[in-house]
Amino acid sequence: MSALERANELSDAEDHTQAIAYYEEAADAYALLKEERWNMLMCVFNLGLCLRQADRLDAAIGAFARALALAEDQRTPFDTERERKTVQCKTHDELGKVLADKQSFTESLHHFTTALDIAKTMRDSLELQGIIRRHMANVLEDKGDTDQALAVCGQALEDLQTAGSEPYEIHQTTVDLATVHIVRDEHATAVDLLHEAINGFESLPGTEFAIAHARASLANALRFLGRFAEAERQYALADTVFRRSGRQSSIAYNLQNSALNYAEQGKWEAADRTYSEALSKFEELGVSDYETGRTLMNHSETIRLAGDPERAEEVCRQAIAALNRAEGAGGLVGMALTVLGCCLKDQQRLPEAETALMESVRLIEQNEGSAYSLAYAEMDLGVVIADQCRFDEAAPHFERAREEFLRCGMHYEANLVNREEADALQRESERAHDAEKKDALLVEALSLAVRAAVDADERRFQFPASDARMRWIQRVAEPSRELALSLAADAQDAGLVSELVASWRTSGVVSPSSGLERARGGDPGRPPHHPAQATVPITGVMATDAENGVGGVGSVEGLGDPSGGVRGSANAAGRSIGPNLVMPHGSRSTLSAYAPDLALRRKVKYR
């Protein structure tokens, strides 16, 4: 048996490490024989496939580049010109995929476009065009161009169906289309498509691995719908297959997403453990600095929310170092600096936190990062400046954060800014000596706090599962209510206090005796000279958004203590108030109904 035959046999058995050795041996032999250009082409092309499976991406790019040069060389014999063009298309396609693995998206799209242009010159090439478009859609999605990704992937599915392609290709394209819908926050649609694909795969032989990848994507969609237990089951089913097959990269990425699922439930220990295992595998595989840095950043945020800001800072600095080595990761470095700023804030190293957050804003702007990333950085910067008793400087940052969130249609997050600013205004009012200024500050704070609290209360209807609804009430609605009641008490507005309590008692957010002592009597030590009145109606605030399922929860800010309580407004340590949930960067994971007003974001996905 020749080295090439043995390599092909090992490749079919998915023993990629041994196959690579035999392909390299065969390639060395063919390089000495000019008349063996065709065999040399097949050898280096298959070598590239195995190298990619082994996550040796640079070597894979080199192998495919050699294959492309041979396919374009007129001295390489082909039976027909169509055969030559087909090989060129497939080689450009493989180059596009491996470059996408390295996050070299511009180069990747160039190869897919070239492949598609060649395919269009061939008759009866609709199936080939569909496959190329499917891969192109994946890259467009990774770049954040989800409108184009949806159009291209939809066209790919139509091409394959029209061409009468194999069911496997159609089901795989359905999975990819579902992934685009996940990124677009159209999660119910994604769930339906993924169930359809899984059912289709199950009727075909040899599709266990494809089913596992579909389950991993299904888990992502379920996670975004707040159906964490179902997501956990799907991640576990996928993990079993991945480990049995020995696909280390699939194991690693599945662990990464599973860690997000744990973190969003506040299962910090499980999330920490799972992130650590994923990162260990990333190191073994030599995964890109971009992906490693992004995962380290999410891990850091989880550690911070678990109450260990010192360790979180250490991990976050590792993330920043990795991202600084990555190509085109400036915007992500800015996001990591947002997390670092929060770690420093939690340690009361406020000047350092301010410096980190200012640099975060600069980098996100400079690299044309997402509006929501900029908004989080601006909000956190406002918090840190306000915590240093410089509210006048903090106010423009709160305003910009609110504007950016609203521009993205992220109404919950805009109310998160309202809550932060209300807390800062309350503390500012406590420092004010002029009675009229104190009253004016309380009026403004109360307006913002009531708006945020009513919004948080109404969003409980977005949760079909009782455990998720209670988590929302305990970690979001109750802390928001406490701040609003505290401010109403400061303003000595007994009518507002009564209306708030009656409204939330009816909705089940408060019990008749939960935390109302201060609200009933106020703080006699700090009465305003002239009682302030609320400027926001109690009913109907943000109702249309809640009814439409707008917004999400969770924040880069972390917000609140692990038990979901609220720290006293005069104590800036460990702030701020709100949900103690993870908002992983680059994944925009949330705990609400995950409605379509959320901004675009990049996700790890399965193809």
Model-derived regions, located:
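Short, charge-rich amphipathic alpha-helical segments embedded
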Residues: 28-42, 124, 505-518
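Conserved alpha-helical positions within TPR/SEL1-like repeat arrays
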Residues: 4-12, 39-53, 83-101, 127-142, ...
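Amphipathic alpha-helical segments of tetratricopeptide repeats
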Residues: 27-31, 66-77, 114-124, 155-165, ...
